[in-house]
Each structure stands twice: as structure tokens, then as C-alpha cells.
């Protein structure tokens, strides 16, 4: 008889998150802000790198940016920050397994989302006013990404959001279940690289993209860059991410491991 490591990890994660949230919402907010900020740091560095390498080999920035961005997720998982999209998997699985209530899951997800955004806004403001972004234009890499995203239909954003959070939670499950530290890192980087390269929609990554551009000198040159359209995009992305991470990753893995003592994760 073999016990499920997946279930024990889910139970531990749910208890840890619920305990911190209940005992100190301020501390939970800080961990959530770190997650939004870490992704903004790697987004900012990757976008500048993409612009520089595009001058040498046009189009090559598309390959460089995802690699630099992926380190932001690595920082999150290794440094215990609270990311809403991974919490969608943990908490949905936990609710199905009765380790946490559905109401508390919804409450934590919304709170985490808010402070992921605040962390991204603070970091985004800083980078937008830094020397590296002083000459940002409509033709810069990050401007093009934001304009492309905001031009997408709800249906496409939903699909891209589902796909993104399947990739993200492949990374998270690999980090949780794989023993070797080096293997954990490369599995995380590989899955994140893929979703970013494919331009899938991830709510916290979009917080980072949009925050940097919003506070930059290029903001007024971006088509459809207005609050209603941004909120539309974020709302649909959130739903897509929940479907991908919660319903298509967390829920199935919880079902596969529940009441099993042989074929378990």
C-alpha cells in the first residue's frame, strides 16, 4: 500500500495558506505582492533583452523573452510567494478532497489576485521610470505584446488562458512531486517557457506586462489600452486560468489520487 504524496502535499499547502490568510492577512498580502513583483522583474528584464537582441537578429527576441521571464516563476516557487494561478490548482484540489472549503478557496483566490496586481503595479511603476524604459516606444517588444493581447476576442483570451495555466501547473506539480532540485528547476523553466513562447494568457503575467506599459511614456500609443478593455481582458483570463489550473489540472489529479493506494502520485 502506497500513500499519495500529491494528497499530502495538497493538504499541507491548503492548511498553510488558510492558516496564514486567517491569522495575518497582511503577511499573506506581502507574499502575494512578492509573486506579482517577481514576475514583473523578469518581464522587465526579458522585454529589454528582447529589444536589444531584435536589433541584432530581427525576431529573435521572441525566443529570448520566454527564457528570461520563466525565472520569475522559479523565484516564486523557490521563495514561497503566493501566486493566484498555482493556488487555483492547490485550492481546487484541496476543496475537492475536503481539505479546505470552497468558500475559503474563492476568498483566498480573490485576495491573492488583488495583491498579485498590487505587487505588479508597484514594480511596474519602478521599471517604467527606470533608465532602461526611458525611451520605450510603440515599436518596443513589450508594447507590441500588450497591444496584441488587448486586441484579442473574449473567446481567444479564454482559450489562451486555459492553455497557459495547464502549462503553469505542470510546472507547479513538477516542483512539488519531483525530488531533485536541479530537475525541479528545469521542469519549471521548460513549462513556463512554452506558454510564454506560445503567447498564452496568464493573469499575473499580464499584470506585469500592463503595469510596466501603463506607467511608461509609450502608454498613450497603445491601441485599445483603456481601463474597460483591460478589465475585460483580465476577467476573461482569470476564468480561463481557473478552468485550466483548477478544473483541468487540480481537480483531475485530486480525483486520480482519492481513495487509491497503488497507482498514486
Language-model features: locations:
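Alpha-helical transmembrane segments and their helix-helix packing motifs
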Residues: 1-265
Amino acid at each position: 500500500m502506497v500513500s499519495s504524496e500529491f494528497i499530502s502535499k495538497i493538504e499541507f499547502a491548503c492548511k498553510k495558506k488558510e492558516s496564514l490568510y486567517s491569522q495575518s492577512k497582511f503577511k499573506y498580502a506581502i507574499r502575494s505582492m512578492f509573486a506579482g513583483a517577481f514576475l514583473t522583474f523578469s518581464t522587465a528584464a526579458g522585454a529589454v533583452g528582447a529589444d536589444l537582441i531584435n536589433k541584432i537578429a530581427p525576431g529573435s527576441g521572441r525566443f529570448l523573452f520566454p527564457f528570461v521571464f520563466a525565472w520569475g516563476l522559479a523565484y516564486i516557487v523557490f521563495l514561497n510567494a503566493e501566486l493566484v494561478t498555482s493556488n487555483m490548482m492547490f485550492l481546487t484540489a484541496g476543496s475537492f478532497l475536503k481539505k479546505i472549503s470552497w468558500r475559503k478557496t474563492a476568498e483566498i483566490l480573490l485576495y491573492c489576485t488583488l495583491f498579485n496586481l498590487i505587487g505588479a503595479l508597484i514594480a511596474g511603476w519602478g521599471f517604467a521610470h527606470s533608465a532602461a524604459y526611458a525611451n520605450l516606444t510603440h515599436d518596443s517588444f513589450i508594447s507590441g505584446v500588450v497591444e496584441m493581447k488587448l486586441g484579442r476576442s473574449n473567446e481567444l483570451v479564454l482559450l489562451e488562458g486555459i492553455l497557459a495555466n495547464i502549462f503553469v501547473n505542470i510546472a507547479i506539480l513538477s516542483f512539488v512531486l519531483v525530488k531533485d532540485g536541479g530537475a525541479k528547476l528545469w521542469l519549471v523553466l521548460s513549462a513556463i517557457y512554452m506558454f510564454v513562447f506560445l503567447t498564452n494568457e496568464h493573469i499575473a503575467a499580464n499584470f506585469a506586462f500592463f503595469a510596466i506599459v501603463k506607467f511608461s511614456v509609450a502608454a498613450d500609443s497603445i491601441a485599445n489600452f483603456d481601463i474597460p478593455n483591460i478589465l475585460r481582458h483580465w476577467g476573461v483570463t482569470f476564468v480561463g486560468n481557473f478552468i485550466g489550473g483548477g478544473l483541468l489540472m487540480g481537480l483531475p489529479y485530486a480525483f486520480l489520487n482519492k481513495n487509491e493506494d497503488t497507482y498514486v502520485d
